[in-house]
C-alpha cells in the first residue's frame, strides 16, 4: 500500500450522522459568514458607532469560525494533508482572534453596561418629562380656564352679575354640584348666604362668622378642604345619597367695604372677607386636584379685584350722578342769580336814569338860583337844597358802583395821571366843607412820592374822598391830616390782612395813605362793621350823624381791585380815628415822562365864565330836562335851540352850531344812530359841531358806544352851572371831553 497524508478515522463512519454533521457545518458556516455582512451593513447605516475596531475583531472571529466549519466539510471523508494544514491554520487563527476578542471584551463590557444604565436613566428621564409635560398641560388647561373665567368675570362691572357669573362658570368648568357665596352682614357678626349656583337654597340664611371652620378658611389664603357637614357646606339635600362630595372653601377679600353696606364695623381698615364654598358631585369617587384648588384660589383673587373695580365704578357713578344733580342745581341757581342780577341791574339802570333826570333839574335850577340876587335866608335855603341834592347824587353813584363791584362788571381804567394833583384836588374840595365845621385839614406829601403814576385816577380819588369825607363827617372840631408816602417793604405786611401778599418790583410801588382825625372815635369791636353796607354803630348812631353809608364798603372793594387793603384804628370813643389804605400803582416809563398824556384841569380862575353868541343845540325827549339844560346854557350866554326829535334836529342843525347836547338813552330814540347821521351830514370835521352825550347812564358800555359812533364827549347828569361852564370851556379848547364813569 502506498503511503498518504490521510487521517484515518478511529471509528467507522455512520453515513446518516455524517450527513447531519455535514449539513450542520454548512449552515453554521453560512450563518457565520452572514453575520459580519449584517454587522457591516448596519454599521454603515449608523451615523455613530464608537467601537469599529472591536467590530473588526469580532467580525474576524466570526469569519474564522465559519471558515473552520466550512473546512470541516472536507474532513468527514478521506482528505489530503493540505486540507489538514488548512484546517489547522484556520483553527490557530481562530484561537488567536478569539482570545484577543475575549481580552478586548473585558474593557468593552463595562461600557456596554453603562450604556444600559444610561438607557434606564433616559427612560426614567423620559418618564419624568412625560409627567412634567402632563403638569404643564394641566397648568395650561388651568390657565385657559382662569383666563376664560377672568374674561367672563370682567366682562361686566355690575357686582351682582360678577358674583353670579363666577358661580356659573366655576360650576361649569369644574363640574360642581353646588357653589355658593356667603357675604358678611352689616354688623359684621354673621355670614349671609347671598348667591348659589342651583338657586335651590334659602338665600338669606345666616351663620355666625366666628365658627372654627370659617376662622380656618379666613386665616389662610389657600383653598381649604372642609367637612361636608359644616354649616356653610350644607347647601344641598342628599335625598337618599349617602356619600357627599368633597367640599372646599376659599376666602374672597372685600377690597372695598362700602359697596356692601358694612360701614357699622368698628374698624374699616381691618380686612374683611366673603366665603366661597364649592362642592363636588355626591356619590362620586372624584377628589380635588391641586390644579383645581389653584384655579379656585386664582378665581377668588380675580373676583376680589373685579368687585373692587365694580365698587369704584358704582361710587364714581354715584358721584357723577350727585355731581350732575349739583351741577343742575348750581346751573339753576346761577340762572336765577343771573336773572336776579339782570333784573337788579335793569332796575338800577332805570332808576338811575329816572332819578338823575329830576336831580338834574333840582341841581341845575338850584345852581342858577345861587347866582341870582338872594337874601341871606334864601341863599342858605338854596345852598341846603344844593348840598342835599349833591349828597343824593353821590349816594346814587355809590349804589351803582357797589352793584357793579358786586357783580364784577366794574373794571379799573388804567392810565397815567398826576398823583400829586389828585391829593391837591381832594384837599381843595374838602377844605370848604371842613371850614364850615371849623376843622383844619393838612396835606402831607412825602418827597419820595412819584409825581406821576399808572392806575385808575377816578377810583383812587373816590377812595380818598370817601375816607376823608368820613373823617369830616364824624369830627365836630379839631384837625384832619392827610399823609401820602411810598410804603416800605417792611411796613407792607399786616396781621389784619393775612391774605395780602405784596410783591416788590421795579415796575410798581405801593402808595400808603393815612387819614387821621380828632373826631368822635369808635369802639374797637365796632370797626369791622364799618366796611359793611350802610353800617351804623351805636356810637355813630347816638350822634345823629348817620351811618357810614356805602362809602367805606365801596372803598374796601376799590382798594381790593387795586391789589391793596384798608383798615381803621381807634383807641375808643372820643379819641379819634386813623384810616389807612395801601394800593398798588405803576411807574410810568422814564423815557415817556416828558410825553405823558396828561392835561392839567382848568383852574377856576382860568375857566371862561360866559359864552355870548355860542350856538348850541339841545335834544332831549324829557321836557323838564330839556328846559333845564336850555336854561343853564342860556344863563351862560349861549344861543340855544332845543328839540325833542331826531328829524327835527337834523333839519335845524348847521355849521353855525358849535356844540350839540343830546341824550343818547331816550326811549324809542336811538341816539347812536343820530350821531352816525350827523357824521354823514358833515363829512369835514371842522364843519361838524362838537357832539356831547348828556346822559344819566353811567355804565361803561354807554361810553364805549359813544366813542364808537364818534361822539366827542360824555357828560353825566345832573349838571350844575359851574359844571356846565367848565364843560363848555374844555370842549371849546380841546373838542373832546369824556367824564370818568
From Swiss-Prot:
The modification 4-aspartylphosphate is found at residue 663. The keyword Transmembrane helix applies. Residues 350-589 form the Histidine kinase domain. The keyword Transmembrane helix applies. PROSITE patterns: HIS_KIN, RESPONSE_REGULATORY. Activation probably requires a transfer of a phosphate group between a His in the transmitter domain and an Asp of the receiver domain. InterPro entries: CheY-like_superfamily, ETR, GAF, GAF-like_dom_sf, HATPase_C_sf, His_kinase_dom, HisK_dim/P_dom, HisK_dim/P_sf. Keywords: ATP-binding, Copper, Disulfide bond, Endoplasmic reticulum, Ethylene signaling pathway, Kinase, Membrane, Metal-binding, Nucleotide-binding, Phosphoprotein, Receptor, Transferase, Transmembrane, Transmembrane helix, Two-component regulatory system. It is a multi-pass membrane protein. GO terms for molecular function: ATP binding; ethylene binding; ethylene receptor activity; metal ion binding; phosphorelay sensor kinase activity. Residues 615-732 form the Response regulatory domain. GO terms for biological process: negative regulation of ethylene-activated signaling pathway. It comes from the Eukaryota. Residues 158-307 form the GAF domain. Cu cation binds at residues 65, 69. The modification Phosphohistidine is found at residue 353. May act early in the ethylene signal transduction pathway, possibly as an ethylene receptor, or as a regulator of the pathway. Homodimer; disulfide-linked. This is Ethylene receptor. It comes from Malus domestica (Apple).
Amino acid at each position: 500500500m502506498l503511503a498518504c497524508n490521510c487521517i484515518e478515522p478511529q471509528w467507522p463512519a455512520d453515513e446518516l450522522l455524517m450527513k447531519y454533521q455535514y449539513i450542520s457545518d454548512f449552515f453554521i458556516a453560512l450563518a457565520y459568514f452572514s453575520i459580519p455582512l449584517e454587522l457591516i451593513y448596519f454599521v454603515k447605516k449608523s451615523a455613530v458607532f464608537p467601537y469599529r475596531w472591536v467590530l473588526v475583531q469580532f467580525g474576524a472571529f466570526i469569519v474564522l469560525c465559519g471558515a473552520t466549519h466550512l473546512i470541516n466539510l472536507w474532513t468527514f471523508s478521506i482528505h489530503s494533508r493540505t486540507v489538514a494544514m488548512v484546517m489547522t491554520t484556520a483553527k490557530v487563527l481562530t484561537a488567536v482572534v478569539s482570545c484577543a476578542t475575549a481580552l478586548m471584551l473585558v474593557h468593552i463590557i463595562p461600557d456596554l453596561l453603562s450604556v444600559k444604565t444610561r438607557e434606564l436613566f433616559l427612560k426614567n428621564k423620559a418618564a419624568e418629562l412625560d409627567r412634567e409635560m402632563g403638569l404643564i398641560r394641566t397648568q395650561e388647561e388651568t390657565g385657559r380656564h382662569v383666563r376664560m373665567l377672568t374674561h367672563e368675570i370682567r366682562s361686566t362691572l355690575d357686582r351682582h352679575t360678577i358674583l353670579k357669573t363666577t358661580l356659573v362658570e366655576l360650576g361649569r368648568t369644574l363640574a360642581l354640584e353646588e357653589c355658593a357665596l356667603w357675604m358678611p352682614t352689616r354688623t359684621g357678626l354673621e355670614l349671609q348666604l347671598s348667591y348659589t349656583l342651583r338657586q335651590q337654597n334659602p338665600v338669606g340664611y345666616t351663620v355666625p362668622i366666628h365658627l372654627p371652620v370659617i376662622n380656618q378658611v379666613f386665616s389662610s389664603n389657600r383653598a381649604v378642604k372642609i367637612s361636608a357637614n359644616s354649616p356653610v357646606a350644607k347647601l344641598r339635600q342628599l335625598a337618599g345619597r349617602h356619600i357627599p362630595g368633597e367640599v372646599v372653601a376659599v376666602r374672597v377679600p372685600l377690597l372695598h367695604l362700602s359697596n356692601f353696606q358694612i360701614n357699622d364695623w368698628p374698624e374699616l381698615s381691618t380686612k374683611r372677607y366673603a366665603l366661597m364654598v364649592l362642592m363636588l358631585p355626591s356619590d362620586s369617587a372624584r377628589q380635588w386636584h391641586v390644579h383645581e384648588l389653584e384655579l379656585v384660589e386664582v378665581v377668588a383673587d380675580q373676583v376680589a379685584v373685579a368687585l373692587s373695580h365694580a365698587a369704584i365704578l358704582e361710587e364714581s357713578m354715584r358721584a357723577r350722578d350727585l355731581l350732575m344733580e349739583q351741577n343742575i342745581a348750581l346751573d339753576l341757581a346761577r340762572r336765577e342769580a343771573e336773572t336776579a342780577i339782570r333784573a337788579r341791574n335793569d332796575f338800577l339802570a332805570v332808576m338811575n336814569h329816572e332819578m338823575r333826570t329830576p336831580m338834574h333839574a333840582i341841581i341845575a335850577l338850584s345852581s342858577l338860583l345861587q347866582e341870582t340876587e338872594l337874601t341871606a335866608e334864601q341863599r342858605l335855603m338854596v345852598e341846603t337844597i344844593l348840598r342835599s341834592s349833591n349828597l343824593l347824587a353821590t349816594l346814587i353813584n355809590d349804589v351803582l358802583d357797589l352793584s357793579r363791584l358786586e357783580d364784577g362788571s366794574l373794571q379799573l381804567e388804567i392810565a397815567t395821571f398826576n398823583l400829586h394833583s389828585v391829593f391837591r384836588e381832594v384837599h381843595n374840595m374838602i377844605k370848604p366843607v371842613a371850614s364850615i365845621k371849623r376843622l383844619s385839614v393838612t396835606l402831607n406829601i412825602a418827597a419820595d412820592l412819584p409825581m406821576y403814576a399808572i392806575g385808575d385816577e377816578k377810583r383812587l380819588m373816590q377812595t380818598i374822598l370817601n375816607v376823608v369825607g368820613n373823617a369830616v363827617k364824624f369830627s365836630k372840631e379839631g384837625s384832619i391830616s392827610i399823609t401820602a408816602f411810598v410804603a416800605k417793604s417792611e411796613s407792607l405786611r399786616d396781621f389784619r390782612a393775612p391774605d395780602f401778599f405784596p410783591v416788590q418790583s421795579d415796575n410798581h410801588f405801593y402808595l400808603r395813605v393815612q387819614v387821621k382825625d380828632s373826631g368822635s372815635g369808635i369802639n374797637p369791636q365796632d370797626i369791622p362793621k364799618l366796611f359793611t353796607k350802610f353800617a351804623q354803630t351805636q356810637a355813630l348812631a347816638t350822634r345823629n350823624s348817620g351811618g357810614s353809608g356805602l362809602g367805606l364798603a365801596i372803598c374796601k372793594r376799590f382798594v381790593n381791585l387795586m391789589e391793596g387793603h384798608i383798615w381803621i384804628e381807634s383807641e375808643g370813643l372820643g379819641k379819634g380815628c386813623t384810616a389807612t389804605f395801601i394800593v398798588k400803582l405803576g411807574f410810568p416809563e422814564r423815557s415817556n415822562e416828558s410825553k405823558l398824556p396828561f392835561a392839567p384841569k382848568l383852574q377856576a380862575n382860568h375857566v371862561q365864565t360866559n359864552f355870548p353868541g355860542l350856538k348850541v343845540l339841545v335834544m332831549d325827549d324829557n321836557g323838564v330836562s330839556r328846559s333845564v339844560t336850555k336854561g343853564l346854557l342860556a344863563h351862560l350866554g349861549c344861543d340855544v335851540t332845543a328839540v325833542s326829535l331826531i328829524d327835527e334836529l337834523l333839519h335845524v342843525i348847521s355849521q353855525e352850531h358849535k356844540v350839540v347836547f343830546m341824550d343818547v338813552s331816550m326811549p324809542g330814540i336811538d341816539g347812536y344812530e343820530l350821531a352816525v347821521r350827523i357824521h354823514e351830514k358833515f363829512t369835514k370835521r371842522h364843519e361838524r359841531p362838537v357832539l356831547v352825550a348828556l346822559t344819566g347812564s353811567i355804565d361803561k358800555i354807554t361810553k364805549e358806544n359813544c366813542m364808537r359812533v364818534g361822539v366827542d364827549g360824555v357828560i353825566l347828569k345832573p349838571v350844575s352851572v359851574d359844571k356846565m361852564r367848565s364843560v363848555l370851556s374844555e370842549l371849546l379848547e380841546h373838542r373832546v371831553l369824556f367824564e370818568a364813569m
